Swiss-Prot record:
GO biological process entries: cytoplasmic translation; ribosomal large subunit biogenesis
Any one of the GO CC terms: cytosolic large ribosomal subunit
NCBIfam families per the UniProt record, alphabetical: rplX_A_E
Family classification: Belongs to the universal ribosomal protein uL24 family.
Full protein name: Large ribosomal subunit protein uL24
Quaternary state and interactors: Part of the 50S ribosomal subunit.
A Pfam short name: KOW
Function summary: One of two assembly initiator proteins, it binds directly to the 5'-end of the 23S rRNA, where it nucleates assembly of the 50S subunit. Located at the polypeptide exit tunnel on the outside of the subunit.
Key words, A-Z: Ribonucleoprotein, Ribosomal protein, RNA-binding, rRNA-binding
Signal sequence residues: none
InterPro entries xrefs: KOW, Rib_uL2_dom2, Ribosomal_uL24_euk/arc, Ribosomal_uL24_KOW, Translation_prot_SH3-like_sf
GO MF terms, alphabetically ordered: RNA binding; rRNA binding; structural constituent of ribosome
Length: 119
């Protein structure tokens, strides 16, 4: 039985093993990718091009530079802020708040999986 208590739900998210936490790094794909491959969402990877859909950076687009599996957030090229000393740092954005506009198909396994799901 799964608990309905919010505190236990949060604890479950915080204590998930990394191999299960990667399932939380899923984002919606654009309409042209969805029609091409017959998928609605896919796990975000380094190299994918994404568009931010929510928040102060909404509408901005860039390539994923880094994916943090522990926090479920992405660093996107071109979306930075300045520290007090002037050095730029990435703004980490949650994977659920972006939409994938271009897939990185350099990995043969990923390409094969997408071709298999094609309708």
């Amino acid at each position: 039985m799964v608990s309905l208590k919010p505190s236990k739900q949060r604890k479950l998210l915080y204590t998930l093993p990394l191999h299960q936490r990667k399932k939380l790094l899923v984002a919606k794909v654009s309409d042209d990718i969805a029609s091409q491959y017959g998928i609605k969402r896919i796990r975000v990877r380094k190299g994918d091009t994404v568009r931010v859909m929510r928040g102060g950076n909404s509408g901005k687009e860039g390539k994923v530079v880094e994916v943090n599996t522990k926090t479920g957030r992405l660093a996107i090229e071109g979306i930075t802020r300045k520290k007090v000393d002037g050095t730029p740092v990435y703004v980490w954005i949650h994977a659920s708040k972006v939409m994938i506009t271009k897939l990185d198909l350099s990995d043969p396994r990923r390409r094969e999986k997408l071709e298999k799901s094609k309708k």
